Amino acid sequence: MSGERAKRFPLALEDLKRAPRKSEGRAGERHAAVAGSKAADKPAAVLKPVAVKPAAVRTALPGSAAAKPATAPKPTALKPAMPKPAAPSVAPAGAFALTSERVRERMVERLRANGVTDARVLEAMAAVPRHMFVDPGLATQAYEDSALPIGHQQTISKPSVVARMIELAMAGRTLERVLEIGTGCGYQAAVLSHVARDVYSIERIKPLYERAKLNLRPLRVPNIRLHYGDGRVGLPSAAPFDAIVIAAAGLDVPQALLEQLAIGGRLVAPVGAQSGQHQVLTLVERVAHAQWRESRLDRVFFVPLKSGVI
C-alpha cells in the first residue's frame, strides 16, 4: 500500500477480518451470553391468550394451618335485601291463651276468697275464656271483677256476680235443664254449660243474639240452645227448668217464669228499680205447685228487664 493510501485508509483489509478478542468471563456467564444470543436470533413466539379460571375458595378446617390467600372469586351482584314485615303489635293467639289461663286462675282465687265455694262453679269459671266475649279493646280488662259494655246499652256481668248467681241456682245439685234470660254476649251461658246438661238462653236484641252465636261457635259448646225472643215470656216449650237465671232487673219476677220453674227448682234474679237503685239479688224457690219462697240477698246493679224484641 502506498504511503498516500495508507494515510487515507489507516486499517488494512486484514485488520477488518480479524475480530477483536473479548475479555473472557466466568463459564456460567459465557453460557448465558451464548444462550441469549441464540434466543435473540429466533423470532419471538406468538402467545395465545389463556383463560384464567378463578381459584376455588377453600375453607380452612378447624385447627388447620392458615391457608394461603386465594384469588378472589368473580364478584356476584348482590340483591337488595327485602325489608322484614313489622312484628304484630299484639301477642300471638297461643301466647295470649297461656296468659289468659294464668289470669283466669288468679280470677278464680279471688272468687274463692270472696266466698264462692262450689268446686264445679270455680272450675267452670276457670274453663271459659272471658276475653273471647268482650270487645278486643277491652280484652286486657276481661278478668277484672267489673262489668264491661257489650253494646246496645248492655253489659257483661262481673265474674263475681256470675259465679254467685250460678252457685245459688245450683245449691250443690246437678242441674239437668237451665233457662237463662238475657244471653247478652253469651258468657254466662258458656259457664252454665259446664254445670248443666242442657242450657236454654233467650235474647231480645237481635244483634246481641247474633253476636252470642259467633262468640260461642269457636268453643264448640254442644249443650247450649240460643233463642231470639222476649225473655219475660220464657220458653214454655222447654219447661220445666231446674234453674232459671235472669240477667236483667225488673220490678218483680214475671209470673210466666215462676210457672216454668220445676218444683224444687230455684230462680235467681235481680229485683228493683230499673234506674239501678235499690236492686237486690233475689232467690225464689218453688216449694209446691202454687207456692214459692223468696229470699233477698245482695245489693247488685243490672240493666233493666224489658219486654218485646228489637
Curated annotation (Swiss-Prot):
Annotated Gene Ontology cellular component terms: cytoplasm
Chief location of this protein within or outside the cell: cytoplasm
Catalytic residues as annotated in Swiss-Prot or TrEMBL: 157
GO biological process: methylation; protein modification process; protein repair
Gene3D superfamilies found in the cross-reference section: Vaccinia Virus protein VP39
Catalytic activity: [protein]-L-isoaspartate + S-adenosyl-L-methionine = [protein]-L-isoaspartate alpha-methyl ester + S-adenosyl-L-homocysteine
Domain of life: Bacteria
PROSITE patterns: PCMT
An example molecular function term from Gene Ontology annotations: protein-L-isoaspartate (D-aspartate) O-methyltransferase activity
Stretches for region Disordered: 1-42, 64-90
Keywords in alphabetical order: Cytoplasm, Methyltransferase, S-adenosyl-L-methionine, Transferase
Enzyme class, first EC level, given as a word: transferase
Basic and acidic residues compositional bias, start-end: 14-32
Annotated EC: 2.1.1.77
Subcellular location per the Swiss-Prot or TrEMBL entry: Cytoplasm
Stretches with biased composition (Low complexity): 64-81
Family: Belongs to the methyltransferase superfamily. L-isoaspartyl/D-aspartyl protein methyltransferase family.
PANTHER family from the UniProt entry: PROTEIN-L-ISOASPARTATE O-METHYLTRANSFERASE, PROTEIN-L-ISOASPARTATE(D-ASPARTATE) O-METHYLTRANSFERASE
Task performed by this protein: Catalyzes the methyl esterification of L-isoaspartyl residues in peptides and proteins that result from spontaneous decomposition of normal L-aspartyl and L-asparaginyl residues. It plays a role in the repair and/or degradation of damaged proteins.
Protein name: Protein-L-isoaspartate O-methyltransferase
Gene: pcm
